[in-house]
């Protein structure tokens, strides 16, 4: 859990914003959402593999688009 120390004369809103940002960087909310329901190991592998395929296809399409514009 991220810890944020409130500095002297620092408004509460600023400290809260820093805390939210540190939670986002640490991935606390995504971890909570991921652990909310049990996911079987096979479905987890399947989901991760599908995400990797999607990332790879997106990267290839970006590279191809970049090459076609360089004439």
Curated annotation (Swiss-Prot):
Gene3D superfamilies: Ribosomal protein S8. It comes from the Bacteria. The keyword Ribonucleoprotein applies. Residues 45-59 have a biased composition (Basic residues). It holds the Pfam family Ribosomal_S21. GO terms for biological process: translation. Residues 34-71 are annotated as: Disordered. Residues 34-44, 60-71 have a biased composition (Basic and acidic residues). Keywords: Ribonucleoprotein, Ribosomal protein. InterPro entries: Ribosomal_bS21 (IPR001911), Ribosomal_bS21_CS (IPR018278), Ribosomal_bS21_sf (IPR038380). One of its GO terms (cellular component) is ribonucleoprotein complex. GO terms for molecular function: structural constituent of ribosome. Belongs to the bacterial ribosomal protein bS21 family. PANTHER family: MITOCHONDRIAL 28S RIBOSOMAL PROTEIN S21 (PTHR21109), SMALL RIBOSOMAL SUBUNIT PROTEIN BS21 (PTHR21109:SF22). This is Small ribosomal subunit protein bS21. The lineage of its organism: Bacteria, Pseudomonadati, Pseudomonadota, Gammaproteobacteria, Alteromonadales. The gene is rpsU.
């Amino acid at each position: 859990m991220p810890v944020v120390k409130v500095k002297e004369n620092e408004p509460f809103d600023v400290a809260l914003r820093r805390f939210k940002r540190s939670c986002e960087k640490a991935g606390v909310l995504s971890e909570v959402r991921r652990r909310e329901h049990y996911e079987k190991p096979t479905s987890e592998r399947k989901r991760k593999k599908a995400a990797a395929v999607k990332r790879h296809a997106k990267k290839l399409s970006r590279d191809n688009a970049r090459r076609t514009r360089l004439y």
